[in-house]
């Protein structure tokens, strides 16, 4: 079996993010030290990198499932989890990455192009790792001082991609089977393709590096084409993708064939017809030269055979009338190879300069579109004259007449994945975030009522719940007592006199309040003394005062006071 594979489907998955920690600091003499849970580590990503040492996609055929490392969970004592290791996957230069489309369990076909890894070191992140969950120390603020929950890590991105290798060569050799393409590449370079005297010996493309003086260029041997290849005959047009990047197309024509109804001119036109059919279905990148407009040369092979030599001399003027350069060669005797080599080198040099100028012009004319800045302001509804919401709410109806509301958006779906639904406080925090984002207001605007079913997310990550808009974002009543806002520990409240540590300003204010209260009491007592309600023996005299409660009138024998 050949070790050359130029198309594979790969299932990639980024690493999951680690969960945050909901740790509480415990230290001697500090019973209320607060939260200290660290954040979870981010998951690793799957990255394809163009590597000149890679020559085939064979490894991905036998190992199509690739998963990056996951992040670890956060720990107490403010320790964050470690990041998952990125998975670096080398691919040959010239590999194109496509999004795989198709039904589950069936063969996938290429969709949108994700990357074109043409040059050494080109990188493409195809599966992003999940973000690590925040620990409770990161969730704490002045109103939520001791969160009893942490956020879960996000799942890594998971998808199918198709890798398609398109050989990067300067010259592509096309021709009928047994025209001598493999023999030509073996004679001009150090490549050692399989050579035999039967059709379709070459089943995979072969690349060879040719040296001409101080310059070098590459040639690609494309498996043989026959009329009807666009309809699937022979090897079809499967391998013609390898000529998409070549700037020069060289027709190798067998002048010694004994097959009926074949001659050099008919072979040339038959191959051009197949190339045209392939070019009609091809979507080239911006600025690329269409295949019918690329320069062509004609190589008349096997002139070491006398009859072939005569035929080559006969048809040469016909090709020159079409504006084509014609070379008569023999791969067996190496006749004409030197002239062909230097002619191809000069043509390659000319095309490289043209390509460089074209790429520079495209770079100067490129339009850069920058995304709108969304930082700082809360998005408004489109009908309010602002930007669109960061989510959408749609009213859906099932076949049985039941109605539910579907919430879609990056933030709501991400928040749902981060929530631990076994923790009531975490669920409440999610409700606060959704309300602050405007989901509840949008649900009301769409006609939702308490108890209606609401769905957030899609697929296996979807969450269903009955909408209850009565929970306030500031505080809620649990067990009949006001426990304050979610994540608030009343032991840490500033108004708690048992543990509150007063500042110097508070001490001075309390001292002045105490002194003012004492002065007010003294003034009230002095007013009562002056009114005669009481007397101070050390200050007041012993004179009889009828109005005094402490008068010194003489008492009678029967105990009555003498007037």
Curated annotation (Swiss-Prot):
Residues 383-469 form the OCT domain. It is found in: Cytoplasm. InterPro entries: G_OBG, GTP-bd, GTP-bd_Obg/CgtA, GTP-bd_prot_GTP1/OBG_C_sf, GTP1-OBG_CS, GTP1_OBG_dom, GTP1_OBG_dom_sf, OBG_GTPase. Residues 2-168 form the Obg domain. Pfam families: DUF1967 (PF09269), GTP1_OBG (PF01018), MMR_HSR1 (PF01926). It is an enzyme of class 3 (hydrolase). GTP binds at residues 175-182, 200-204, 221-224, 301-304, 330-332. Its main location: cytoplasm. GO terms for biological process: ribosome biogenesis. GO terms for molecular function: GTP binding; GTPase activity; magnesium ion binding. Its cofactor is Mg(2+). The keyword Iron-sulfur does not apply. CDD domains: Obg. Residues 529-563 are annotated as: Disordered. Mg(2+) binds at residues 182, 202. One of its GO terms (cellular component) is cytoplasm. Residues 169-349 form the OBG-type G domain. Monomer. Belongs to the TRAFAC class OBG-HflX-like GTPase superfamily. OBG GTPase family. An essential GTPase which binds GTP, GDP and possibly (p)ppGpp with moderate affinity, with high nucleotide exchange rates and a fairly low GTP hydrolysis rate. Plays a role in control of the cell cycle, stress response, ribosome biogenesis and in those bacteria that undergo differentiation, in morphogenesis control. This is GTPase Obg. It comes from Bifidobacterium longum (strain NCC 2705). The gene is obg.
């Amino acid at each position: 079996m050949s070790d050359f594979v130029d198309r594979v489907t790969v299932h990639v998955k980024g690493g999951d993010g680690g969960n945050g920690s909901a740790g509480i600091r415990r230290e001697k003499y500090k019973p209320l030290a607060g939260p200290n849970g660290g954040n979870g580590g981010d998951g690793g990503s799957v990255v394809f990198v163009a590597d000149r040492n890679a020559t085939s996609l064979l490894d991905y055929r036998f190992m199509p499932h690739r998963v990056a490392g996951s992040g670890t969970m956060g720990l107490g004592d403010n320790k964050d989890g470690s990041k998952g290791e990125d998975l670096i996957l080398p691919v040959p230069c010239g590999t194109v990455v496509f999004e795989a489309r198709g039904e589950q369990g069936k063969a996938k076909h290429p969709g949108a192009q994700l990357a074109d890894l043409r040059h050494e070191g080109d990188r493409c992140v195809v599966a992003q790792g999940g973000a690590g969950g925040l620990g409770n120390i990161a969730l704490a603020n002045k109103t939520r001082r001791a969160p009893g929950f942490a956020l879960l890590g996000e799942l890594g991105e998971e998808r199918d991609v198709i890798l398609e290798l398109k050989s990067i060569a300067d010259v592509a050799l096309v021709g009928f089977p047994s025209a001598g393409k493999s023999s030509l590449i073996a004679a001009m370079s150090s490549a050692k393709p399989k050579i035999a005297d039967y059709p379709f010996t070459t089943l995979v493309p072969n690349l060879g590096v040719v040296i001409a003086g101080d310059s070098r260029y590459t040639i690609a041997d494309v498996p043989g084409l026959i009329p009807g290849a666009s309809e699937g005959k022979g090897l079809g047009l499967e391998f013609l993708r390898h000529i998409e990047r070549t700037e020069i197309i060289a027709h190798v024509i067998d002048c010694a064939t004994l097959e009926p109804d074949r001659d050099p001119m008919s072979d040339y036109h038959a191959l051009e017809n197949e190339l045209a059919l392939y070019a009609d279905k091809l979507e080239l990148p911006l600025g690329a030269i269409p295949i019918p407009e690329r320069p062509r040369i004609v190589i008349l092979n096997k002139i070491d055979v006398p009859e072939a030599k005569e035929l080559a001399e006969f048809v040469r003027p016909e090709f020159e009338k079409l504006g084509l350069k014609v070379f008569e060669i023999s791969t067996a005797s190496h006749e004409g190879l030197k002239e062909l080599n230097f002619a191809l080198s000069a043509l390659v040099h000319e095309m490289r300069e043209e390509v460089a100028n074209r790429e520079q012009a495209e770079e100067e004319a490129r339009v850069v579109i920058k995304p709108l800045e969304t930082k700082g302001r809360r998005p408004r509804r489109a009908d309010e004259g602002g930007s669109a919401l960061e989510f959408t709410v749609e009213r859906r109806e099932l076949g049985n007449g039941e109605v539910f509301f579907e919430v879609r958006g990056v933030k709501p779906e991400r928040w749902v994945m981060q929530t631990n639904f076994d923790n009531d406080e975490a669920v409440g925090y999610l409700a606060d975030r959704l309300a602050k984002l405007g989901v509840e207001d949008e649900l009301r605007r769409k006609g939702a009522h308490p108890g209606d079913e609401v769905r957030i997310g899609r697929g296996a990550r979807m969450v269903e719940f009955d909408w209850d808009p009565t929970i306030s974002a500031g505080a809620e009543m649990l067990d009949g007592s006001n426990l304050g806002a979610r994540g608030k520990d009343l032991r840490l409240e500033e108004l708690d006199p048992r543990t509150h540590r007063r500042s110097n300003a508070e001490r001075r204010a309390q001292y002045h309040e105490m002194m003012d209260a004492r002065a007010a009491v003294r003034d009230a007592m002095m007013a009562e003394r002056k009114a005669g309600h009481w007397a101070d023996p050390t200050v007041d005299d012993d004179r009889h005062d009828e109005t005094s409660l402490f008068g010194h009138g003489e008492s009678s024998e029967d105990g009555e006071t003498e007037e």
